[in-house]
Each structure stands twice: as C-alpha cells, then as structure tokens.
C-alpha cells in the first residue's frame, strides 16, 4: 500500500489523481490532502478519502469547510498546506499545485526525503538548477507525471540517467495549429480552452494553444534526463497517441503510445514499478490507426521560440519566462489581453531579464515578483 500526500487536489491533475486512488483502494491511500481555495470540491474529497491530514491554504475558504471526517486533522493557511508536502506518514508526495507556487511544495517534499511525483512544470522550469542537485544530494527519487516525460521515462527503462542520442517530445500543436495570423487575432478565451485531444486546466490549455507549454517541457526534459538542448527535439503530432520517443545511438527509436489520458502517468508515478489497468488508455488495434509527425518551424509559434531562447540562456531567465506567461494568460482569460499579445508581453518581459545564475529559492521568488510587475506594466501599456 503506497501512502500518498496530494498537493493541489482540486485542480485537473489533482482530481484525476483522486480518481486513480479511489479506483485502486488496494494499492493507494491518500494520507494527506492540500489545496488552495476550492472549498466545495475539497469538502467532497475529504468525505471520500478521509485523509489523516488536510489543509486549505486560503483561510477564508477554509472557514467554509462544513464537515471534517472523524480521524482527519484539518488546518488552514499556507504553512499548513506546505506541511502536507512533508507529512511524516506519506511515502510519495504528488505535487499537482499549479504555477510557481508549486516549487516550494516540491522542495519541501525533497528535503523531507519523500518520493516526488511531479506534475508541477514550474518546479523544473524555474527551479531545475536547485531541484536536481538537491535530489542528488538527498539521494531522492523524482518521478514525472507529465505525459511526455513519463513516456520518455518508460522508454528509458525507468532510468532517468540512461544513455540516449536524442529525446523527441511530441506536441499536438494546440487548438490553433492551422490558424492564419489574422484568425489568431480573433481568438477568444472560450475558443482557446477547447483543446483538441486533452482535458486539462485553463492555464495549461492556453499554454498548449500558444505552444509555451512545449517550451516548458523541453526545459523540464533538460533537467530531468540531463539532456543538452541540442539533443531535444519537439515535433508536431496532432493525434496525441505517441506521447514521446527516444532515439538511441544505433538509430533505433522507442516510443510510448496510448490514448490520451493523464491517469496512465499518474498511476505509473504512484505505483512504480508495478503497472495497473488504466481506464481510457488502451488503443483499439482492431481498427485502423494512423498518425503523423512534422517539424516545428521557427516563427510558427512565437511563445515556443521565446521559451527555447530562454532555455539556452538559462539561469533565472526561465523563471522570468514563466512569470510573464502566468500574468499574460491570466489577463487573456480575464478579457484584458488579445491572444496574439500573449507572446508580446512574454517577449517584452524576457527582454528585460535578467539571466542570473540561480542561487536560492528566495532569489527565484524575487525574480518571479519582479517579472510579474514588468509583465503587468506591459499589459497596461497595450
């Protein structure tokens, strides 16, 4: 029985993790649960899971929790939520909290000696230079929950340090891969939230549409697998059946295929080395299957290009990139920014940098705050 602490239980990955756990009661048990402010859903999760420890970061939302199961200790506030990431009884901490805020939970889990099942992209995008050395120092274990990195992990025989020639990360291209520049100027939030193949949260769905998300995944792969950026290639694959591939020195390419469902990488990160049947993942080979790949030309997806430039520059610049992206996407979803201006805001913020060597978590917090202020200033001037 794997004992799990789930951080970010009310988001898209968090909800699917709860389903995986409830569908496998003989394999998994959630002993600690934390979320930000979605008190209604959190209340239901408390009743279904009956964790030993639970916390809502938002103290006002926590006041609306009406029923706490017997045996559950419920707390409120950011420190209480952070404590769930190092909860003593947990074997595995799955960090599904969104945004830069997820980094502090990942660091807490690593420092507590927990297995880190990582769904939060920003942990490695912003803090990879801190996180990976810390894992090595602590003798820790990190397991990817992103479908692309889980696919690579599987192709490498579950060995993050296995040798390879090249990593091939697939991308659907998002909802607007075939739109003209003129059509893109008319994109609304409602249009952008309809992803062609994946069911995801709002922020990551917009990042998929701009392809910023794929740039993040390249940065994550660099840190997770020790890959030079020249050995990572992103390719368009509209069908989202091949989740990533690994090319080896002899020319062989190994791929991982399944129907698009996040439940597969979730249950694998929790259950490794065992596998379990996953609802919705199985392909039907009694029917014809076809899929395609095509290169991503520079200039087609400006946010992707900016992300790659930031990746190669390194240091604190990926943290600036992420902060600008979070602010720009929030403004777009709120109706305060055009879809095509997301890239303008990100580029303008990144150009004001700086790209400093990553020294500490506190430095990254300062970088994040500074970049958010710059992005907000740029949005106000548009």
Language-model-derived ranges and their functions:
Residues 1-382:
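Catalytic, metal-anchored helix/loop core of enzyme active sites in primary metabolism
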